[in-house]
């Protein structure tokens, strides 16, 4: 699960920064295994973004805030953000995206904190994607060697994603 989902997550979602880059515009993706997906999702779709310095940093981890931004752009939320109930997002770059996803039941946070600067885990990403696309987890727990390390809230989503072939 770690290798395959990590590669997908990197290719489809690894991006932070403010500048939307066009296809083939990143200085550090030429020859990268995910170059084609990065170019498509950044240039053609405009969903993922690079850094202001013209790089994409395809092997860098992604934060919870950046992932929220990607989901927000993908889902095209039109609603305005509700009042902020998170103690750690006020004035941050990702505040609006996090609040819209939270109002939609996609981004849940943790004990009053959104943790936007924390690296997103695979199980957090799977649960957010599952909630975003209303994928009903109906499958038993997955059969991975590290299943005991998957949080209870994400276990059914991981099992469902495995059953559908999204995770291996």
Q: What residues fall within each predicted segment?
A:
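IQ-motif-like calmodulin-binding regions
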Residues: 126
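Feature responds to low-complexity, polar/acidic, surface-exposed segments characteristic
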Residues: 2-36, 47-65, 71-96, 103-123, ...
């Amino acid at each position: 699960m770690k290798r395959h989902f990590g590669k997908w997550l990197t290719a489809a979602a690894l991006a932070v920064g403010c500048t939307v880059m066009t296809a083939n515009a990143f200085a550090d993706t030429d020859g990268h295994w995910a170059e084609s997906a990065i170019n498509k999702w950044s240039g053609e779709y405009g969903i993922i973004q690079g850094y202001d310095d013209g790089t994409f940093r395809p092997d860098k981890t992604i934060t919870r805030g950046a992932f929220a931004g990607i989901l927000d752009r993908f889902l095209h939320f039109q609603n305005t953000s509700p009042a902020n109930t998170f103690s750690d997002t006020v004035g941050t770059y990702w505040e609006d995206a996090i609040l819209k996803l939270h109002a939609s039941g996609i981004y849940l946070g943790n004990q009053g904190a959104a943790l936007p600067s924390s690296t997103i885990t695979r199980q957090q990403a799977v649960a957010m994607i599952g909630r975003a696309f209303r994928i009903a987890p109906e499958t038993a727990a997955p059969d991975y060697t590290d299943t005991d390390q998957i949080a209870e809230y994400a276990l059914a989503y991981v099992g469902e994603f495995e059953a559908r072939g999204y995770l291996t």
